[in-house]
Amino acid sequence: MARSGRYKVPFRRRREGLTNYRKRRKLVISKKPRLVVRKTNKHIIAQIVVAKPIGDETVAGADTRILTKFGWRGDENNTSAAYLLGLVVGYKARMRGVEEAILDIGLHRPTPGARVFAVLKGALDAGLKIPHGEEVLPSDERIRGEHIAEYAAKLKEENPDAYKARFSRYLQRGLEPERLPDHFEEVRKAIQQHYENKLAKIVAK
């Protein structure tokens, strides 16, 4: 409760932990499209957003559920899925004529190697130009899910029951987690081929 005339009530979205208005103002002033990354309990969402006087316009976007279109059978909320989502949204943005953007992670803590930066890495590999420091990007090994594959192989050998319980969702989808890096590469190639073909047709017109 306010106890002084100098007390300022924060904007509702700031009170609810949804928007950092100081950071948002800097992003809007840049006049560049924003790669907006948000997370839910089950999925990751990425959008290319352009600020306009009447409000934000979403130029391209998707969430990790789109990855099933390309055969993805892994988790939809891990680092590998985050990268693949960034790849998809990066290509979608380029198809709409967007070639550069700035990263908007909202109130997410900018921890190096975090999933929001895996999305960034995917968008960069799709050809978008986005200012960043290399130190924040996850390693290629982590993006490929090699840490998951190694842990799964060890657990399968030491405790098969725990392995089946821990990776039940993978196994239900027909994916052995030890194969995650190979599966990741298959899906990445499918995404690249799909969108590179579409971009080639746009350029040819």
Curated annotation (Swiss-Prot):
Membrane-spanning parts: none
Protein keywords: Ribonucleoprotein, Ribosomal protein, RNA-binding, rRNA-binding
InterPro entries in the cross-refs: Rbsml_uL18_euk
One GO BP annotation of this record: ribosomal large subunit assembly
Domain of life of the organism encoding this protein: Archaea
Molecular functions (GO terms): 5S rRNA binding; structural constituent of ribosome
Gene Ontology annotations for the cellular component aspect, listed alphabetically: cytosolic large ribosomal subunit
Annotated SUPFAM superfamilies: Translational machinery components (SSF53137)
SUBUNIT field: Part of the 50S ribosomal subunit. Contacts the 5S and 23S rRNAs.
Function: This is one of the proteins that bind and probably mediate the attachment of the 5S RNA into the large ribosomal subunit, where it forms part of the central protuberance.
UniProt similarity note: Belongs to the universal ribosomal protein uL18 family.
HAMAP family assigned to the protein according to its UniProt record, in alphabetical order: Ribosomal_uL18_A (MF_01337_A)
Listed name of the protein: Large ribosomal subunit protein uL18
Lineage, top ranks: Archaea, Thermoproteota, Thermoprotei, Thermoproteales, Thermoproteaceae
Gene field: rpl18
